[in-house]
Amino acid sequence: MNMPNERLKWLMLFAAVALIACGSQTLAANPPDADQKGPVFLKEPTNRIDFSNSTGAEIECKASGNPMPEIIWIRSDGTAVGDVPGLRQISSDGKLVFPPFRAEDYRQEVHAQVYACLARNQFGSIISRDVHVRAVVAQYYEADVNKEHVIRGNSAVIKCLIPSFVADFVEVVSWHTDEEENYFPGAEYDGKYLVLPSGELHIREVGPEDGYKSYQCRTKHRLTGETRLSATKGRLVITEPVSSSPPKINALTYKPNIVESMASTAILCPAQGYPAPSFRWYKFIEGTTRKQAVVLNDRVKQVSGTLIIKDAVVEDSGKYLCVVNNSVGGESVETVLTVTAPLSAKIDPPTQTVDFGRPAVFTCQYTGNPIKTVSWMKDGKAIGHSEPVLRIESVKKEDKGMYQCFVRNDQESAEASAELKLGGRFDPPVIRQAFQEETMEPGPSVFLKCVAGGNPTPEISWELDGKKIANNDRYQVGQYVTVNGDVVSYLNITSVHANDGGLYKCIAKSKVGVAEHSAKLNVYGLPYIRQMEKKAIVAGETLIVTCPVAGYPIDSIVWERDNRALPINRKQKVFPNGTLIIENVERNSDQATYTCVAKNQEGYSARGSLEVQVMVPPQVLPFSFGESAADVGDIASANCVVPKGDLPLEIRWSLNSAPIVNGENGFTLVRLNKRTSLLNIDSLNAFHRGVYKCIATNPAGTSEYVAELQVNVPPRWILEPTDKAFAQGSDAKVECKADGFPKPQVTWKKAVGDTPGEYKDLKKSDNIRVEEGTLHVDNIQKTNEGYYLCEAINGIGSGLSAVIMISVQAPPEFTEKLRNQTARRGEPAVLQCEAKGEKPIGILWNMNNMRLDPKNDNRYTIREEILSTGVMSSLSIKRTERSDSALFTCVATNAFGSDDASINMIVQEVPEMPYALKVLDKSGRSVQLSWAQPYDGNSPLDRYIIEFKRSRASWSEIDRVIVPGHTTEAQVQKLSPATTYNIRIVAENAIGTSQSSEAVTIITAEEAPSGKPQNIKVEPVNQTTMRVTWKPPPRTEWNGEILGYYVGYKLSNTNSSYVFETINFITEEGKEHNLELQNLRVYTQYSVVIQAFNKIGAGPLSEEEKQFTAEGTPSQPPSDTACTTLTSQTIRVGWVSPPLESANGVIKTYKVVYAPSDEWYDETKRHYKKTASSDTVLHGLKKYTNYTMQVLATTAGGDGVRSVPIHCQTEPDVPEAPTDVKALVMGNAAILVSWRPPAQPNGIITQYTVYSKAEGAETETKTQKVPHYQMSFEATELEKNKPYEFWVTASTTIGEGQQSKSIVAMPSDQVPAKIASFDDTFTATFKEDAKMPCLAVGAPQPEITWKIKGVEFSANDRMRVLPDGSLLIKSVNRQDAGDYSCHAENSIAKDSITHKLIVLAPPQSPHVTLSATTTDALTVKLKPHEGDTAPLHGYTLHYKPEFGEWETSEVSVDSQKHNIEGLLCGSRYQVYATGFNNIGAGEASDILNTRTKGQKPKLPEKPRFIEVSSNSVSLHFKAWKDGGCPMSHFVVESKKRDQIEWNQISNNVKPDNNYVVLDLEPATWYNLRITAHNSAGFTVAEYDFATLTVTGGTIAPSRDLPELSAEDTIRIILSNLNLVVPVVAALLVIIIAIIVICILRSKGNHHKDDVVYNQTMGPGATLDKRRPDLRDELGYIAPPNRKLPPVPGSNYNTCDRIKRGRGGLRSNHSTWDPRRNPNLYEELKAPPVPMHGNHYGHAHGNAECHYRHPGMEDEICPYATFHLLGFREEMDPTKAMNFQTFPHQNGHAGPVPGHAGTMLPPGHPGHVHSRSGSQSMPRANRYQRKNSQGGQSSIYTPAPEYDDPANCAEEDQYRRYTRVNSQGGSLYSGPGPEYDDPANCAPEEDQYGSQYGGPYGQPYDHYGSRGSMGRRSIGSARNPGNGSPEPPPPPPRNHDMSNSSFNDSKESNEISEAECDRDHGPRGNYGAVKRSPQPKDQRTTEEMRKLIERNETGPKQLQLQQANGAGFTAYDTMAV
């Protein structure tokens, strides 16, 4: 083994360990570049990081340096931190990241750890402050409040107990009582209840009432923000005192307080006693046992026994004593308060560069409280220094690096860093060249060379096996320095021996470092061990020694002790290279002689011994000078004992690091023995205070211990203050400094008054402050002069105090430099000047800068008065004159200067009156005035007083307005509008008031009313109407003349706007106004407001009045009705309430209607049960009976809709007894027993049991089971002439029923004829077979005969007698009903029975007659057909209006009469009835045609209706007569006579009010058009009138041309033939030319023109199937001979010029003939009305006589929204797709027969005409698209949500106009959803149908019977159908309603825009449209489109339509 090499390896290992321990101290010593620096923290993590496991946390650490430092996170023990997957990560930017984690993943070593951030670069390392990381796992916790026991009258403290695991994160935020009292922290401290800063609830002076409350605390988690109430409620247990008791303190519960600075804290003193004790708090003076009372102020308060400190400061820290006393005893408790201040540290200087060997000093400057430890680190390693100042006496290379100062306490830490750089140039030694290991033979010489470099130049030394080599005869060391500065060293060994072998080392060393090199020199030879010197080592250290072996080769090296080879214990380690290591050396076990033995392979060995001496270092025992501080003059001593350590020991003492010399400064040092030193101080003084240190030293080491000696030193002056004098205005400073221990507190006080004695604290202000005992007074003034006391107190002795006088030397001063003084003219005046300052002071007076000498004017007198503060001088003036208005100046002078003051003397008088009063502006309530300012009397005008009054009042009854004197304009407010006022003004100054100005008169303007209508009452009239009544506002608030009222209403609790109606003012004094609001929703709350208006505007809205309409009946039945059979006589019925919106009221009860199903038709047999719950049990029912049940809800309005019938059957039960029993003798041994079934079988009869028993003997009863279908039993084997008793029972599955009556029979030879069957009633169904039994017995065999209705029966094809005697009737008919009797007869006897046969057949047509009519009801009388035999269950009454759909009503069979109510007034109706029974519905009666009473409105006389003024016209609508039908509304339009366009004024004027048309021009002719509406129609009236002139006069009538008669016209023409003939001829030529051109063009485009234009063709009309897309290409192209459709924005209608074709005898292109005969109405297809005789249809009929087939022009006309001549406008595809057009399905085509027109007998085919379209201004989504119930049609009905009363007529009006299309046809109702243009809304049939002639002739009849705005809808407006896609809007038009014209044609210009707007549709709340009588399946839009395509392209369908005369319906081009 190569021993030298091994030893070299181990030495290198130890060197590496040493290098690691030294950190980075072997870095290059070259001074860094200027921009290079060590690390410095930019962002240091905070001391504590608390986070929730649900949020996680990121800790950021940033540092700067050059090069950029590396960030490493370490634990508190210095080990590096790594990633823990999912729990802890270190991001690339140096952040320590804790992701959110689950509770079960919590790890304490990760989540509850102290971390630090380490930043390092090549210049050093720094470590951040400690980062205490604490993750909080969200845990459920509950806070508790316990009972607290308290004696009445004492204070109580209730604690909120928070579990410890969340206590650090949860705080109390409030307290709550069960009486809803809430208390929060930070409230005032003078209340009974106080929440302390620490969270407790403090209750002072507890009384009995406090014991009744319960208390809960609310806590908040500061990490999660969660708040919660305590789980328990605490109470106070209040004890009544029985006897006196001393105070008792429970101090164990409360811990010392630690609070952050500027936070609030409470120190508790929980004591109780009786009587209630008093509390007093003291604070101990720091370091002493003395205490002083706590001074209470705004910051420190005492509440009962609790001391509350707000905004705590560090000075508040200390020990507090609470002393509690009452009349019985006392107690006290101490509490320590620690106020912490955040720690911070700073090292001065932060960077310093120090040359080698020079000292370096770092000072750690820190703040905060408390400071527990101060420590220093270098490059992240502790250096064991705990003083604030770190001093390095001689800087070495290894001292360079980063130094840190750490300050710590229990809560936090802080650090500061500084860098020490080395100055100059330092190059550590470097071995540049060295010797290598060598093996050689003995003899030759050896030369070892070592070359080293460095700066400064190193010195090289040599060692052999760790022992320095010195020169001798064989070893020579030499060295020199090369020119490069390297040192070359040689070791010469002469004649090397074997003993010279070993480990040679050269060491290059300079003051900046060491470098070394070692290598083995192996010399062949025997083993040799060089002598080893004695080794001394300190106990506890590690011994490392290497055996110095020579010789080569060496086989082994071992160590021995006491001849035992080592190791012999765990502490010893032996290495093959000869190294011995002993750890933790101890004297007793390790001090010995160790032997090293070296051997070679030949067995030669060498031995060498090493003596190891273990030295023990000294150890000093702790000592102290006592716990409390000593006083001056006391004796102090301390013993320094060193129990351990080798002798000799040196023991030294130091004070504050300075050595203590025996006998100096009062110190006595006594060496009691070798190990003890005594320190004595005979008399303590301030010098002796400090830190004492005892230092014990021996060769093994040093030990020390420090103890502090506190000496209480009373204050002594360092600088005692003396009297001072300062110039006024200067900054004064008076020093007062004292020394002592504890450090004295220096305070200043000022004497109260002018003499010393009583002093008060100086108030802190901006100019007075005390800093470190020095009093500073900035800008000192005379007020600061006086005696001051400086006091220094530290609690030792009585303290020091000094009284000084501070004088302020001031020149004279006037406190008031300038003032005004006034005097009334002629009165005396005194002017005074007071000068303050050092006396003597002289004062002179000047007047207007001229010396005033009283001698020159005896009116002036000057007097002086000496004051304590100065001099007062007075100038008296006996009588003031105008000339005395001047500037007087007094000048004061003393030795220090002078000052002056001025008095502006003003002699005053009253002002003159204002003038030039003018009115600048006026309004209804104010007037703006201006005036000229008058002479002010040499005194500023204080104010103007504006006086005003009403013109009729006197000036003693005035109002005033005060105006500032500096203005000449003002506004007088609070005037009443439209009132005359007189106004004047006066001026006023301090002297008096002027005279009044001249008055002006004004009249205020009118304003809108300011008052609200009064006494508003809203009462429901019925379910849809409410009456509103009110009275006018107070007369004073009219502000003019009230013209009317706006009454607004809306649904309550909605954000919709009010809908207003206008009511004219009633002039009668005190009369109540009223208005009925109609068409409201049932049982809906409405809000009503009213405002009055005059010509200026509307007044304020009244307060909302809310009212419900009357309750209605529920419109929907209860849902989810179900029944459950409980027993044989009970059924449970359950249901769910109807939807709330359909209840229409408050549901009070539910009614259950029930009856057996077979009696359900009979109303009289139905039973009713009321209940308030949602289920009920029906009792007392028939057993095993099927019941039918319905449920309905009932409100105050009545019964609601019944639910769909449900059925349940009761359970079976045992049957009743058979109804009757017969026993018939059949022979001498047989009897036939027959019976009738039980009347109530109560189930299905399973069998009968016949019981028989012989009479007179105790024989057992015999039984015989008989099947259920057998009604007789033959008993045989009976004894002759022996009576037998028989009875029968019936059985069901439940059991056997009751027994029948007993009957006795006796067998006999005589068998008379008897019939076993019973009389019965048989019911047969129409056309079915019937059989009636007649079972007979007898001997001889009886003869059976039958009689029908008393007539003997003879057999025929339908009737015959069966062998068993039964009568069989086949195919029963109605005539078969009646009595059937069967007769049986033999020679002995005869018998008979009678059956009744009832034939069930559908009822025949009943008789319907009209009994009575009213305006809204018809009364019909119903009578069944005489031929009905089957019971009639009831009637179905069918009725419909002329243009409506069929409606039905069920009528009870018992009702003789029936009222059809809710009909339209003055309308035609059709009525018929059908009967029904349990077979079904019967035949229909004849149709009854009738009408309700009433007519259209009737025109009034013009004078009674119109009242004209200059700018308005009043309309008295009460002058109109309603024709018997209530008026619904009026439409008012007007225009000037010379204008064409009508202007709509209102389209919804209520009939009960007057109406005023405003804003007319005076002296102008106007046309007025009034359209009056009721349900019978409308009437139009036009009036001409001229407004009056401005003065009220009339204007001359207009000049109208005289009307010309026919004769006049002919005469004019004949007299101008020379002009007429050429004109006529020219016109004829032009017309002929146009006709020829048209014919030629039509031939070239025959198909296209026919398709587009010739739509009025007759039965052969068709559409070119080759061009189905023609409409799409062209849109709509107007035919050449027709007026074009209107351009959007134009003002004329196209409908008036379009010609209409007529079918029948007229040509296909005939124009409209106004004289043509009926029917002017194109009737609608009606549902099939059954004709008498079961004729349900009519296949063909000559309809041409009555009907025509309208073509495309007829259908298109109403819309008038098409594009011009092929011009196409792209529509919104989403809207265009929503609307399709469909052809009519002809009445004759298809399997469904056509239907007659509405007013014709059934069976006549008809074609349904389309509804005219209309347009109006855009309205949002007003109409919905509907699909009809049958056919292919599109229906528009109002959207149900639309509810605009401004455009809605009454509900009945629109029901009145309903039209139906069931089986086909096109039906349009209403405009598109967005355009609602009145320009095109007149229905064609009314425009042209009844204008002239016909049954409804008269020029205005198209407004007549049906009104121009006849609404067409599929079903009643009460029940609109289901919504479907809305149609697209038509092209836009001009929205200017004022310029629009309904129509420019003469034929139809009477219809107005108002009519169109008026008829937009019923209100949305009218409900759903009813279905047609015979509905077909609804089709989707896509299905309809496919159907259209099929119809258009199908030849068969077209041919069929041609054959049947089918025309094409107009296409809805609104979708183009």
Curated annotation (Swiss-Prot):
InterPro entries: DSCAM/DSCAML_C (IPR056754), Dscam1_C (IPR021012), FN3_dom (IPR003961), FN3_sf (IPR036116), Ig-like_dom (IPR007110), Ig-like_dom_sf (IPR036179), Ig-like_fold (IPR013783), Ig_I-set (IPR013098)
Superkingdom per UniProt: Eukaryota
Gene Ontology annotations for the cellular component aspect, listed alphabetically: axon; dendrite; extracellular region; neuron projection; neuronal cell body; perikaryon; plasma membrane
Motif stretch (Polyproline tract (probable SH3-binding)): 1925-1932
Localization per record: Cell membrane; Cell projection, Neuron projection; Cell projection, Axon; Perikaryon
Annotated signal peptide: 1-28
Biased composition (Basic and acidic residues): 1944-1962, 1974-1993
UniProt domain Fibronectin type-III: residue ranges: 913-1007, 1012-1116, 1117-1213, 1217-1310, 1402-1495, 1499-1594
GO terms, molecular function: antigen binding; axon guidance receptor activity; identical protein binding
Segments for region (Disordered): 1688-1719, 1787-1846, 1862-2016
Motif PXXP motif 1, residue numbers: 1685-1688
Residues glycosylated per entry: N53, N325, N492, N577, N820, N1022, N1055, N1186
Comment, domains: The ectodomain consists of 10 Ig-like domains. Ig-like domains 2, 3 and 7 are highly variable in different isoforms due to alternative splicing. Ig-like domains 1-8 are sufficient for homodimerization. Dimerization only occurs when all 3 variable Ig-like domains are identical. Intramolecular interactions between Ig-like domain pairs 1-4, 2-3 and 5-6 cause the ectodomain to adopt an S shape conformation, bringing the variable Ig-like domains 2, 3 and 7 into line to form an interaction surface.
Name under which the protein is recorded: Cell adhesion molecule Dscam1
